[in-house]
Amino acid sequence: MVDIYGLVVALILGIVEGLTEFLPVSSTGHMILVSYMLGFNNDKTKIFEVLIQLGSILAVIIICKQRWFLLFGLNLKKWEIYQHNINHGSRLHLYHIILGLIPSSILGLMFYEQIKSFFEPKYVMYSLILGSLLLLISQLIHDKKPRATCIDDISYLQAFLIGCFQCFALLPGFSRSGATISGGMLVGVSSDAAFEFSFLLAVPMIFGATILDLYRHLPVLSLDDIPMFIIGFITAFLVALITIKLFWRIIKGMSFIPFVLYRFLLVIVFYLILI
């Protein structure tokens, strides 16, 4: 029998995921808090929140496919929304992505169980505050004349350091995009370049986390869960695709201050709800 309420929850969480995945506000944090409000907080919740992120990642792969083809030494017709930033003699390649993945991959595997224990609303609120402080610091003290003005200028060391900042995002509520963009700005990368590099890092990072969660939680899942996962996945994909296409250039040039204020407001709202 189809669980109508479960499908509605999946639809809502898919919308939340698609809207927030690439903003520095933490999509995982939003989904945990919204899941709690909707009463969807059983053993399957944690893996569902990771699985539907694949929908957003598919949207990124489609929109950024030219860059991915170049990373693998291939070429494709030029039509991406940020195509003007792509140099077909690109100096960015897979080594940059691998270096950016190493720190968080190691810590994620070593402390998997401990990290999952933080998937609770109260910890999300703490992480939202900490992530806001990093966003604020990077906004105030970043280099006004960055050494890497476009994504192809990012060095191996900068890629690795951005990956180190990504480790903060292992805490739900911190924001993976917020951590990587802020980290990039603090190590001499322009906000535009850090934003694009954050997009590329998201694909293997979230895909790897999903595979690991599936492996760990497979016994908890059943065939009855498939419709809910499909609804969440498709919704997240479509909403993320629309959001990225509409707001790519706007988000890249924005100050972090509105996001910092939003995150603090979100903490206050959910604190009042949870007490």
From Swiss-Prot:
Name of the protein in question: Undecaprenyl-diphosphatase
GO MF term (any one): undecaprenyl-diphosphatase activity
Something else known: Bacitracin is thought to be involved in the inhibition of peptidoglycan synthesis by sequestering undecaprenyl diphosphate, thereby reducing the pool of lipid carrier available.
Superkingdom of origin: Bacteria
NCBIfam families (alphabetical): PRK00281.1-1, PRK00281.1-4, undec_PP_bacA
Organism: Baumannia cicadellinicola subsp. Homalodisca coagulata
UniProt keyword terms in alphabetical order: Antibiotic resistance, Cell membrane, Cell shape, Cell wall biogenesis/degradation, Hydrolase, Membrane, Peptidoglycan synthesis, Transmembrane, Transmembrane helix
PANTHER family the UniProt entry points to: UNDECAPRENYL-DIPHOSPHATASE (PTHR30622:SF3)
UniProt entry tagged with the keyword Membrane: yes
Pfam families: BacA (PF02673)
Known function: Catalyzes the dephosphorylation of undecaprenyl diphosphate (UPP). Confers resistance to bacitracin.
Transmembrane intervals: 4-24, 54-74, 92-112, 123-143, 154-174, 194-214, 228-248, 255-275
Residues in the signal sequence: none
Catalytic EC class: hydrolase
E.C. number: 3.6.1.27
Catalytic activity field: di-trans,octa-cis-undecaprenyl diphosphate + H2O = di-trans,octa-cis-undecaprenyl phosphate + phosphate + H(+)
GO BP terms in the entry: cell wall organization; peptidoglycan biosynthetic process; regulation of cell shape; response to antibiotic
Main location: membrane
S-S pairs: none
One GO CC term, this protein: plasma membrane
Keyword Membrane part of the UniProt annotation: yes
Cell compartment(s), UniProt: Cell membrane
Bilayer topology term: Multi-pass membrane protein
Gene expressing this chain: uppP
Family note: Belongs to the UppP family.
